[in-house]
């Protein structure tokens, strides 16, 4: 009987973490050792056969662990000791494990400190690196330095790959209206048919200006066809590059500082004469660049004068016939000087 009691006491003491656990215990008394005083009574009740394991503590089977248990005694419930019929209720109720069995959850106060250290600002979180002291953080590169670093991937024209092409200069109403009138007149002269499409925003004014240009321009070409042919022969216009070179001759027309409607209408009339030539050599695609060159010379260099004359409204109201003839002579002289027209042209415009 005593041997059985002794085995039960040793088994219970070992499972409860009492003395005699082995090396490293140092002989220290564990909380489970406090039950030694009741070992004989518990063993006696087991031998009788009617006692519940819960009576060992002096309470019911569902009683909670004694309040005297220290935090170090909190352990997972173990199987019943040798000779016991029910689980050992003296062990602390099992706690849910959120980690692997080999790991132990850190206390709450130990977990709060790393969590506080891990808090980063949105910028640091996006950058993907741990926060550093201000003295060690790299300085933010200026915008100009970032642009300079990407300069290694520039295109052949020196612009950045992501740089959009510069926006074209917005064409004002005077330029748009002038280009529409001159371009339509040159196309009509090349094809020999009137364009019946409606004009742009300044429809009424543009339509009247185009009608006036047809009447005056056609007369200039008839009266000075020989001179125009001589100048065209000297200029030897065959392609778009030759058309672009006409800008130099057009600018020379106004080199003396005199501007009037006679010179302007003669310049446009000669452009129509060139457009007919481009049609005959199958270079109709050059007619539009020719119209743009004439418009550029007139609007870009003579804008102030055109504005003072009220633009194409002033052209429609132009009635000074003598000014028209005087302008024609000056234009022919200018073309003769640049294109090298011979004595026949000089006699014509004397």
UniProtKB/Swiss-Prot annotation:
Entry's localization field: Membrane; Cytoplasm; Mitochondrion; Nucleus, Nucleoplasm
Cross-link Glycyl lysine isopeptide (Lys-Gly) (interchain with G-Cter in ubiquitin) per UniProt, renumbered positions:
5, 40, 136, 194, 197
Q: Which GO terms describe its molecular function?
A: BH3 domain binding; channel activity; protein heterodimerization activity; protein transmembrane transporter activity
Could you say what the effect of mutating residue 159 to A is? Loss of phosphorylation by GSK3 and loss of ubiquitination increasing protein stability
Instruction: Pinpoint motif BH2 by residue range.
Output: 304-319
- Annotated phenotype, changing residue 208 to R: No effect on ubiquitination
Residue ranges, annotated region (PEST-like): 104-175
PROSITE patterns linked to this entry: BCL2_FAMILY, BH1, BH2, BH3
Record Gene3D superfamilies? Blc2-like
Query: Which intervals of the chain are annotated as region Disordered?
Result: 47-87, 148-171
Q: Could you tell me what this protein is called?
A: Induced myeloid leukemia cell differentiation protein Mcl-1
> From which source organism is this entry?
Homo sapiens (Human)
Provide the taxonomic classification: Eukaryota, Metazoa, Chordata, Craniata, Vertebrata
- Gene it is expressed from: MCL1
